[in-house]
Structures are given as C-alpha cells and as structure tokens.
Amino acid sequence: MSEFVIETQHLYKRFGQVTALEDINIKIRQGEFIAIMGASGSGKTTLMNILTGLDTASEGKIILDGVDAAQLDEIGRQRFRAEKIGLVFQQFHLIPYLTALENVMLAQHYHSVIDEAAAKAVLEQVGLGHRIDHRPSQLSGGEQQRVCIARALVKIGRAHV
C-alpha cells in the first residue's frame, strides 16, 4: 500500500493546441482533505477527471493507491474507480425510481456486498436517516447531494472525490 492515495508527477493535459494542465505535481495521503480551486476554465474539472480515471493525461505520471494509472486500460480504470474511488458528481445521477436507501445500496452492488445496515448508517451520518424511504423527487437539492455523498462513503474506496 502506497503512502499516497493520489500522486501526480509532471502531469500535462492538452486539447489540440490548448494546454489545460501544465506540470501538475501533487501528493495526497489517505485521510487528507484538499480543495482544488481556480477560475472558470482553469482546468479543475479536467484534473478531477484525470485523477479519478475518467480521462487520461497527455503526459506525466498518475499513481493511484500505488498503481500507475498509465498501465491501466479502460476496463482497468473502470474497475479501479469502482473499487477504490467514491465520486460525487455535480449532477447527482440518482436513480429517480429508487429510494435514498436503494440509491446508496446501489454503490455496494458493484462490490457484491449488500449491507443495508451500512447504507442506513451513512445516511444517518449525513443527516438523512429520516428520509431513507424518499425518492429523489421528494428530496431537496441539498438532500440529494447528501445521498450522493453517502453513496460515495458506503464504498470501500480509499479516495473520495
């Protein structure tokens, strides 16, 4: 197991003639909280997409929990993401016909470990224990976001983005 959950070395991302990321070097330890800040169009989303395996870098090295991401094909990146990284997107991606509890348990499905008690516990942690049987349309935007956070936390992953 690596000292760093996420590490980049001389990371670059180019879109044609446009350099979106230039010489990015970061090291993030497990349990560490960081903020990626910058103006609109500064590359924050591009960086997050690369760090989570949703995109690839033009050059440089990305080491995710000791694994060189460049050595992973698309299937390998998908598997790594499913097993190691909890994601909370700007768009919530909740299944509208599932309850809050079922949406959280969906993350467990990919690990073949369904633990309703754990799903209820993380919903309690994010302050939604009383809303577990509500569908997304019955929740406020903030509550929907907390369901997504619970869905990310219930996974066994080492990084939550």
Describe each model-derived feature in a short phrase.
Residues 3-158:
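ABC family nucleotide-binding domain
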